[in-house]
Amino acid sequence: MALEIYAVKDSITLRDTQLDPRLAQAKFFTSAPTLAHCPPECGPEIGFCGRSNAGKSSALNTLTGQKSLARVSKTPGRTQLINFFEVPHTGGFLVDLPGYGFAKVPDAIKKQWQQHLGKFLAERRTLTGLVLLMDVRHPMTTLDEQMLSFADHRDMHTLLLLTKSDKLSRNQAAKARLTVQKRRPQSLVLNFSSFDKTGIIEASAWINHHMDGSEQ
């Protein structure tokens, strides 16, 4: 089952409809070390960002139904490039951004990554939405807040995925989501798990809505 959505800003109503296979068509397009090396700005883009151990690659693979679209590493912080995945029906991209905060690299390199990430978020005009992934047990760190500040400055749509929700009881996960939602009323906040597929349908609906070009 998939969902059709009707939305104003980030307030979403969900309705049963036929399974939408669009995200399953996503395919790797290119990688870029900096904004200057990114492909030309054309269709809408949804960026995926989060701490280096937040599960970005696993989430991308789960949302697209592909086991190896994005590389999953046992070493947090291996995503050092800006990776573009084309979604054919939109002419746009899902963009896997370098993780921040935990990577086992020299501080100078870590700072360089953060500068490139900040420049991309601030200046990439076709970036219409941002999916911020946070471990449900440790949400809204200082670095997460900084990423959201970039998005707010651009008046960007934001989806907050509280990953690894299967690690908590249903009640604990619900309380964590409510706490974050109260702090971010302008964002959609979802519990999410690549293990038990919690939040997959709602997250897919949000992404498809903000990639359909209707708000460009």
Where are these regions (language model features)?
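Conserved G1/Walker A P-loop phosphate-binding module
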Residues: A2-K104
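Canonical P-loop GTPase G-domain recognition
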Residues: L23-L35, K167-Q216
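Short, well-ordered secondary-structure micro-motifs
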Residues: P39, N83, V105-P106, T141-E145, ...
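Short, glycine/charged-enriched secondary-structure capping and boundary segments
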Residues: C42-G43, L63, D107-K110, E145-S149, ...
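Flexible beta-alpha connector loops of hexameric P-loop NTPases
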Residues: Y100-K110, D166-S169
